[in-house]
């Protein structure tokens, strides 16, 4: 069975997932594809492993931006696809292959049906970490073509194909990575009094962190601390000199993020004192909340209901993290969920989005961009 052009593009990209700022094959694929398009009205730049494309409008009054992230995840794929990842231990498990494909489809339509306004397509690396949106936004390459408004999407396994979901205002949470390294004194298991056990210290820290949210954050202002990984020790009869905790912090408000971090630091200081150890905290990548511009989002949802075949759902806030929030902090715009009807969720080794969504999304976004880009 033959597949459509953009389904094939998605499958090509799905085979070559790459982690943040190492998306060299992905970047080259995007550039090669752009090279097949008529270039009379196109301008192309690269930034690190990202790509920025401008389609010059017929009578521009503003610049409309579309952002698509392009990186993969360090996950071993279990989909059983014939076009599964050829990069061992890496997978497009968050749908960025679809995001990029839809962006290329919209770009193709924009070249053949030029609108009045300029369009800028931002193929952004490193959304999964360490974060490409903020440095890309601050780059000279993007500053020259900085959009006046911007939009982005993220696939949603739980929604059916033909459905989008979004809301005015806060959509996604503030997020921060959390790493805590503890160092004490190792020793023989038979002589615990001569050592300083960092497995025990780490265990106490994990349990104490559970009280940060329940006793320091307003119950109406959601927040999460999750410790997803603990490492420490070497063998069963040696007391561990070191341990490391890795986790994530997510809050709906900036104020709660500050409060949570303050309490974490106080608790870690207490662990240092009580276990006579050294502790180092690293917050790693931190992402600003995704806050949709109210008027633009309301207008987009109304347009979708009245002028397209897509179903629109007003969703609730999610504790998801997205560095697109940095772009929305600087540029009016919005993000929305795009239903892909997958049994398995984001970051799962068996995520299998319904490819029918690709053509639907391209047609839908082209309708919106033409409507928005030709209005005066």
Curated annotation (Swiss-Prot):
Key words of the record: Amino-acid biosynthesis, Diaminopimelate biosynthesis, Hydrolase, Lysine biosynthesis
Pfam families in alphabetical order: M20_dimer, Peptidase_M20
EC number(s) stated in the UniProt entry for this protein: 3.5.1.47
Pathway membership: Amino-acid biosynthesis; L-lysine biosynthesis via DAP pathway; LL-2,6-diaminopimelate from (S)-tetrahydrodipicolinate (acetylase route): step 3/3
Superkingdom field: Bacteria
Catalytic activity annotation: N-acetyl-(2S,6S)-2,6-diaminopimelate + H2O = (2S,6S)-2,6-diaminopimelate + acetate
CDD domains the record matches: M20_Acy1_YkuR-like (cd05670)
Role according to the record: Catalyzes the conversion of N-acetyl-diaminopimelate to diaminopimelate and acetate.
Name of the molecule in the record: N-acetyldiaminopimelate deacetylase
